[in-house]
UniProtKB/Swiss-Prot annotation:
This is Melanocyte-stimulating hormone receptor. Glycans are attached at residue 29. Interacts with MGRN1, but does not undergo MGRN1-mediated ubiquitination; this interaction competes with GNAS-binding and thus inhibits agonist-induced cAMP production. Interacts with OPN3; the interaction results in a decrease in MC1R-mediated cAMP signaling and ultimately a decrease in melanin production in melanocytes. It comes from Alces alces alces. Keywords: Cell membrane, G-protein coupled receptor, Glycoprotein, Lipoprotein, Membrane, Palmitate, Receptor, Transducer, Transmembrane, Transmembrane helix.
Length: 317
């Protein structure tokens, strides 16, 4: 991965450095201001990855079990869970290997570790791109279901949804390979940052438009039923709060990582940017947190999916 400063790479574990513990420190910087550096222990990475892994496996299992959930919308949610699952698997795998190398329980040559590191980087990058794409696909699906409700089933068909899903996975794999191969090229980094900004703008426009339509619909109902205006205001505030949470989580979890990529291009040698580079591990942890939050926002709010999830858990016991 193209990072500067502190970074989680398997090759660094061959030096058998002591494992990190969670801490907030002001790292001295002789050429600039003091840097606030958040140290993330490997155990925390492992714990976050395992929680995300369990959550997203349950989402995939529930959707696979219930035939009522075999629709384009839930297929997009399932693919988002698979993307987050890959983020978790790559994180757990990398952390476990790093801990084994540091403890001396695993002996490996540098060349083998380098190849494993490259594979994990491809997994991480591909899952990040696919996760962003499926978040956009879910937003588009919801938008069409609201604004083109009568034509929804003719527009969003299963064959069309499968083609979109296949295209996203192929594009994600190709993007990750290009990113890992040409990560030191400025154009590649800028394209990734531009892709994130485009996804953020797309989601913001679609969800704001959906909120406006929902508020208009609430006004129409209130007018027909001759209700008072405060009811509409309460609905609007609730919708605005939901929208703020949805977009806020997306921006807070993904924004720092892409800010990191932007600063690599804009100011790789500046002391202030160097302070931000030191917190790369924190940015990765936030992405893993997003993989934990996604099922809560997009999957577990469905009553049908929650019911199926209870059946899956009962069967497992």
């Amino acid at each position: 991965m193209p990072v500067l400063g502190s970074q989680r790479r398997l090759l660094g574990s061959l030096n058998c450095t002591p494992p990190a513990t969670f801490s907030l420190t002001l790292a001295p910087n002789r050429t600039g201001p003091q840097c606030l550096e958040v140290s993330i222990p490997d155990g925390l990475f492992l714990s976050l990855g395992l929680v995300s892994l369990v959550e997203n496996v349950l989402v995939v299992a529930a959707i696979a079990k219930n035939r009522n959930l075999h629709s384009p919308m839930y297929y997009f949610i399932c693919c988002l869970a698979v993307s987050d699952l890959l983020v978790s698997v790559s994180n757990v795998l990398e952390t476990a290997v790093m801990l084994l190398l540091e403890a001396g329980a695993l002996a490996a040559r540098a060349a083998v570790v380098q190849q494993l590191d490259n594979v994990i980087d491809v997994l991480i990058c591909g899952s990040m791109v696919s996760s962003l794409c499926f978040l956009g696909a879910i937003a588009m699906d919801r938008y069409i279901s609201i604004f083109y409700a009568l034509r929804y089933h003719s527009v969003v068909t299963l064959p069309r949804a499968w083609r979109i899903i296949a295209a996203i996975w192929v594009a994600s794999i190709l993007t990750s390979l290009l990113f890992i191969t040409y990560y030191n090229h400025t154009v590649v980094l800028l394209c990734l940052v531009g892709f994130f900004i485009a996804m953020l703008a797309l989601m913001a426009i679609l969800y704001v438009h959906m909120l406006a339509r929902a508020c208009q619909h609430a006004r129409d109902i209130a007018r027909l039923q001759k209700r008072q205006h405060p009811i509409h205001q309460g609905f609007g505030l609730k919708g605005a709060a939901t929208l703020t949470i949805l977009l806020g989580v997306f921006f807070l979890c993904w924004g720092p990582f892409f800010l990191h990529l932007s600063l690599i291009v804009l100011c790789p040698q500046h002391p202030t940017c160097g302070c931000i580079f030191k917190n790369f591990n924190l940015f990765l942890a936030l992405i893993i947190c997003n993989a934990i939050v996604d099922p809560l926002i997009y999957a577990f709010r469905s009553q049908e999916l929650r019911k199926t999830l209870q059946e899956v858990l009962q069967c497992s016991w």
